[in-house]
Design a protein with these regions (language model features):
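Residue-level recognition of conserved beta-strand positions in structured domain cores
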Residues: 33, 46-48, 98, 112
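Noncatalytic modules at the cell exterior or secretory-pathway interfaces
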Residues: 25-33, 86-107
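Non-cytosolic beta-sandwich-type ligand-binding/adhesion modules
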Residues: 35-80
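Short, low-complexity N-terminal tether/leader segments at secretion or assembly junctions of large
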Residues: 66-69, 104-118
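Aromatic, loop-rich ligand-recognition surfaces of beta-strand-rich domains
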Residues: 19-42
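Short, intrinsically disordered N-terminal pre-domain segments
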Residues: 1-14, 113-118
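Short Trp-Ser/Thr-centered turn/loop motifs at beta-strand boundaries
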Residues: 11-23, 49
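Exposed aromatic-hydrophobic patches
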Residues: 17-21, 79-87
């Protein structure tokens, strides 16, 4: 498993976009989100991009991965610890975007653990 810290105690009252992770092949992953001091319900978007993995950085559009629990494109950060996992992920690129929505305080940390398959 590879482990990457994507956000480390960043402000939850402004938009945050993580660095892109080049996964390059079929992947299983888990995202761990820790929050502290939120006074609203920020929205977390897990996004993929199918730009060629040989590119130094992705081009083209980022597409949100649907939250299958409620058929929207985001996950509401309404708890202090949240884990989201995906099996058989096939996009080349991965990133996380957090929108503050109605939140004006607190911090967010996000880490990613993933395993690739040939």
């Amino acid at each position: 498993m590879r482990n990457v810290t994507l956000l480390n105690n960043v402000a939850a009252d402004v938009q945050q976009i993580t660095a892109e992770v080049n996964m390059d092949q079929r992947t299983e992953w888990k995202v761990y989100i820790n929050t502290a001091g939120l006074n609203g319900r920020p929205q977390l978007y897990i996004e993929d991009n199918n730009s060629p993995s040989k590119n130094e950085t992705p081009t083209g559009d980022w597409n949100p991965i649907c939250n299958t629990c409620n058929d929207v494109d985001y996950f509401t950060l309404d708890d202090t610890v949240i884990t989201i996992e995906k099996k058989d992920f096939k996009a080349n690129w991965f990133r996380i975007r957090v929108e503050p929505t109605d939140n004006t305080a607190g911090t967010i940390s996000v880490s990613l653990s993933y395993k690739t398959f040939p």
